[in-house]
């Protein structure tokens, strides 16, 4: 079984040297991602596509390959194909008939052929010959060139015939690391998750900067969002997660700053701190999830005042997006459930926020801050490799045990999202399994029998460890992490 990876059209429009560089990077990215699924993954770059071969003795890996390829930036679409050779146009027809005869029954169809190489026929001739044969010798409802029930796709590359079994839409965008790095200010909400994704999709290694205003519970939730985005869409490259303890800044704002100016000044302080962190990392741009007019600090006047707190470029990919569109996109990329479970901390500190900040007043208020305040919080920032999020959680989960087997009386809690649970249900003979999505666990765990012990399960063990830590901080000690052998 093979996959033919088609490049995003914008890549094909580049000059030859740039296209070559982008294609090489995409090949490397695909190899890096797939070899975490299967060390025997074979990836081969060609001029206008990339071939991925699934080992013949591992048919069970086909779906996993497809899932990962669909989430790698730079791919327009992926064709899951059956490869063979052919001797004539009639041979092409006979092979197509054998594969599609039953599937065409009762359906209208058309045949589409893409051809490269030297042949005695052209693509239209193959379409007519194969289409006519299928129409005559199958129980299809007939040929329909526009909006058919089914399209039979064939690709001919010199002597090779590729019968397309499935077309998988890709993520689009540019290959990871073909653009410069950015530092995304992430709060865990709808906006920051989507804005981070936009830059991952566009080919930038996206590092995460979190300003902790809500304690460990808030940080745990945000780490889940960042890890999800990286693991699903940016796993080909390592990135950093930076947690900045912003309590001292918030405390001084509450004690010293005029109520109406608090929101704008908080954002300015965040930009200053993030800029210094970015400079240390050699990053030239910040990314935020701000959208014009969404909240009081996001009027054009206030955004202008916020931008003038730093010389660094501030990018806002969501600036003219509607909130519902942002929520819809968060649903598509898998961050909606995280965002629903994370409270918004930034909006609670100012009761009467200004919508038209005056720079003179802002500067006067900022004179009240301690001189070394930003230096102190930046110095105290924790920088970790995002791959080590699970490890960092392990060091904190001192009272929570990880087990690979279930003992009598223990209950397994599947905390995966409903979609993941539906795709691969967890079934354990003779063992009670409860399905409680991670975003409902905090509220529903209190309703469970306190006399029982609960083993949290997810595919990779990261989410279960994060949730175990969260529950432990809430005072629940009848919880373990379940990692089956």
UniProtKB/Swiss-Prot annotation:
SMART domains, A to Z: THUMP
Ranges for domain Rhodanese: 406-484
An annotated GO cellular component: cytosol
Active-site residues per Swiss-Prot or TrEMBL entry: 458 (cysteine persulfide intermediate)
Top-level EC class as recorded in UniProt: transferase
Ribosomal protein as UniProt keyword: no
Chain ranges of the THUMP domain: 63-167
MF GO annotations: ATP binding; CCA tRNA nucleotidyltransferase activity; tRNA binding; tRNA-uracil-4 sulfurtransferase activity
Signal peptide (from-to): none
Pfam family, one: THUMP
Subcellular location(s) of the protein: Cytoplasm
Binding site for ATP: 185-186, 267, 289, 298
Ranges that cross the membrane: none
Pathway given in the UniProt record: Cofactor biosynthesis; thiamine diphosphate biosynthesis
Alphabetized UniProt keyword annotations: ATP-binding, Cytoplasm, Disulfide bond, Nucleotide-binding, Redox-active center, RNA-binding, Thiamine biosynthesis, Transferase, tRNA-binding
EC number: 2.8.1.4
Gene Ontology biological process terms in this record: thiamine biosynthetic process; thiamine diphosphate biosynthetic process; thiazole biosynthetic process; tRNA 4-thiouridine biosynthesis
Disulphide connectivity of cysteines: 346-458
Family, per entry: Belongs to the ThiI family.
HAMAP family per UniProt: ThiI (MF_00021)
Function: Catalyzes the ATP-dependent transfer of a sulfur to tRNA to produce 4-thiouridine in position 8 of tRNAs, which functions as a near-UV photosensor. Also catalyzes the transfer of sulfur to the sulfur carrier protein ThiS, forming ThiS-thiocarboxylate. This is a step in the synthesis of thiazole, in the thiamine biosynthesis pathway. The sulfur is donated as persulfide by IscS.
The name this protein goes by in its record: tRNA sulfurtransferase
